[in-house]
A protein has these predicted regions:
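Membrane-interfacial segments
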Residues: 12, 44-48, 137-142, 146, ...
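Structural signature of transmembrane alpha-helix termini at the membrane-water interface
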Residues: 35-39, 63-67, 132-140, 198-209
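Mature extracellular catalytic domain of secreted serine hydrolases
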Residues: 3, 149-153, 157-165, 169-170
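Transmembrane core module of solute transporters
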Residues: 1-110, 203
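Interhelical loop segments of eukaryotic multi-pass membrane proteins
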Residues: 18-22, 143-148, 211-217
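Transmembrane-helix exit segments and adjacent C-terminal regions of multi-pass membrane proteins
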Residues: 160-218
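Small-residue-rich alpha-helical segments with characteristic i,i+4
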Residues: 77-154, 184-188, 201
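Generic preference for well-ordered alpha-helical elements
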Residues: 1, 33, 96, 108-114, ...
Length: 218
């Protein structure tokens, strides 16, 4: 949800601090529901259902975020990001728990490192891809909405500064262009969530309760 604060700044006209506060439902739900999933997994034993549910909820939440409009109210942007955060939280610790359950004791450390490395690398890569999509879509939309205006007036000013660079008459069209660009970026996590469901459905179904520490050879 790296680009949700950008939507708040550009479309809703808030500053960076306020956009961070408005993004707290997503951050909070990820934290709370990751702990819930981990706790229930330790009690019930199976991690696979949470990973599957995570993919489904992230796809639904991300899909709803693509429907945000300039005039979307609190119910929409609060509810959509909260649902997406629940999905992210349910699957947040799943891969690490799976590695710790499936691998042999001597391979767990390497497996956990690989999981964290892949998550960090892929996350950084997707942010870069999303930024490219945002920039290209914004330029395209501005040319459609305001063909006689230099789009650099908006892009150079940034998400929170363009309002002082455009006229009051042009502002509604700029907001439409920005909204369409940011919501287009949300299709990326939707696609990734749908793709992750394939892996979630075929992941080995094991219980963490069956993992026993093996005595070291003397």
């Amino acid at each position: 949800m790296y680009f949700l604060p950008i939507w708040f700044q550009a479309v809703k006209g808030v500053d960076a601090e306020k956009s961070g506060i408005m993004s707290l439902p997503n951050i909070g739900s990820v934290t709370v529901f990751s702990m819930i999933a981990a706790a229930v997994t330790q009690i019930e034993g199976h991690y696979s259902p949470w990973i599957i549910l995570s993919s489904v909820l992230m796809a639904i939440g991300g899909g709803l975020l693509t429907t945000l409009k300039v005039d979307s109210g609190h119910a929409q942007w609060l509810g959509y990001q909260f649902l997406s955060g629940i999905g992210s939280g349910f699957g947040f610790q799943g891969p690490v728990i799976a590695v710790q359950t499936v691998l042999e004791m001597q391979d767990i450390a390497s497996g956990v490192v690989i999981v964290y490395f892949a998550q960090s690398l892929f996350g950084a890569l997707m942010v870069s891809v999303g930024q490219d999509v945002l920039t290209n879509e914004l330029l395209k939309n501005l040319k459609i909405q305001l063909p006689f205006m230099d789009p650099r007036v908006v892009t150079d000013a940034g998400a929170s500064g363009f309002r002082s660079s455009v006229s009051a008459a042009d502002l509604p069209k700029v907001l439409l262009a920005y909204n369409a660009a940011v919501t287009k970026v949300f299709y990326i996590p939707v696609a990734l969530a749908c793709a992750s469901l394939v892996g979630a459905l075929v992941i080995e179904w094991k219980s963490v309760k069956g993992k026993k520490a093996e005595p070291e050879d003397v």
